[in-house]
Structures are given as C-alpha cells and as structure tokens.
Amino acid sequence: VGDYSADGDSISLRERDGRLEVVGWEDTLRKATVDPATVLGDSLTFESRVYRRLALGPASGTVFRITPRAPYDELMKAALAASPPEEEGEFLPTDLVELVTLDSTIKLDIRYAGTDNFMSSKFYSSPRAFLQRPAAEATIRAHRALTAQGYGLLIHDGYRPWYVTRMFWDATPDPLRIFVADPSQGSRHNRGCAVDLTLYDLATGEPVIMPSGYDEMSPRAFPNYPGGTSRQRALRKLLRDAMEAEGFAVYETEWWHYDYKDWRKYRIGTARFEEL
C-alpha cells in the first residue's frame, strides 16, 4: 500500500475490502506536483510501466514539519507589526464561543498551543477552541450525531488570530503554500468560522487513523485522496457527512478543515485568546 509515480503519472496502491487495488489520482490531485526527492527505491510494475514509490509524508503517527523560512522571533515581530486587510461592508457582530462550554464531551488537541505542529513552535498561550456561535452550535450538533455511531469530535483548531496566519504564510516555502491561507485575504479561521478536527473513538478515547496526519502538506491530506485503507476512507467520509449535514464544507486540500456556510458574514479578527 502506498503511492507511486512514473513520468508524472501518479497512482495509489490501496486496500479495498481486503484486496489490493490500483487507482489513479483524480484531476483535483494533479495540482500537487511530485518532488523527485520523494521518490524511494522500491517500485511497482503495472501495465508494463515501472512506478517508483513516493514518500509523500511522514510515517503514521509522526507530525509533518517544515523548515521555516525565518526564525520564529522574526516571524512574530513582523506579524504583530502588520495589520489585517481592511474590509468594507456590513458584518455580523463577533460572538466567539468556547466549544467546551457547550459540550464537555468534545475533546481538544490544540496543536498550536504546543510544539507538536508543522512549525514546531507554540502560538497560543492555552489550549482553547473558539468559533462564532452559529458555527460552534453546528459543530456540537455534528459531534452529538456522531456519538450514536461510536465516535466524537477531536478539535485541533478553531478561531485563529490573523497574526498567526501571517506567521504561517511567511514561514512556509512557496511550493507548500496551497496548504496555508494568504494573509492578504484573511482566512476563514480568522473569522471564527473554520474548524480543524478529526474523530475519536468513544470506546477507547483515542483518535482514529485517517489517510494523513493533521497539517500534513501532501496529497494525502486532500479530501478526495484515493489511497489508504478502506477503514481510513470510511472514517474520513463519516466525518465529512456529519459536518456537511450541519452546514460546513470541507476545504479542498485538507480533509480536517471545515468552513461554516456563513463565514463571509464575519470580520477578520486578530485578537489573542486572552483578549476574547
């Protein structure tokens, strides 16, 4: 099981119903170019073509990390000195709600409150998750619907101050910027209407295994990535169905990122958690 490439043609060897299956990458995955440095030594011969195995991301359970383009302190200084883009028009008043105050059974694993994230740096002073009230209530409804199937929601991030988005953008190498928001436009996280999340098993309390890890900047993160196991794809779909039923849409390059339908109605925010 894995991902392979031959002359720009990429395929996945995946498990389906206990059998191995070869599937080509869909058109929406072709924007993710293959770095020659990811080609491993092993190969797969399919229809007389030799495909070399790709190392698209870290091993399961390992956090994806980048080498930032500048030191953390420089990134922070520049971001705090900058201002969010000016916006015109009428917006709804900000009403950020802390998710755990609505349902204590929702779990948190706020990666940016520690160093277990793609930049290996701490951005939040405490592990908290906020969303605009309608988005927060919709998230709780999705969580409660999932409990009937033996799962709950594990939150990685919600409202994200704009200055943090600016730091992510400035730190990320150009080829990987499809995975981070452009601060000149602001992000849905900045508006309090985007949530990063996964499932956890109610019986064990442990997060489930998805086709990629959180914040992995590779094609495995795409919501329509065809690889992985049947169970991983089924769990990804279970999460997506629950979130879409409550008015969320999955982000095109991240299976864990969901935007609430009314995100355009809220202003970009840059307040720290302590200021909320």
Please give the residue ranges for each predicted region.
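Generic detector of bulky aromatic hydrophobic side chains
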Residues: 23, 41-43, 47, 112, ...
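Peripheral terminal and inter-domain segments
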Residues: 1-78
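Extracytoplasmic cell-surface/polysaccharide-interacting catalytic and binding patches
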Residues: 59-156, 171-253, 262-276
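K/E-rich alpha-helical interaction surfaces of small helical-bundle regulatory domains
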Residues: 1-10, 243-247, 254, 259
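Beta-rich nucleic-acid/ligand-interaction surfaces
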Residues: 162-168, 258-265
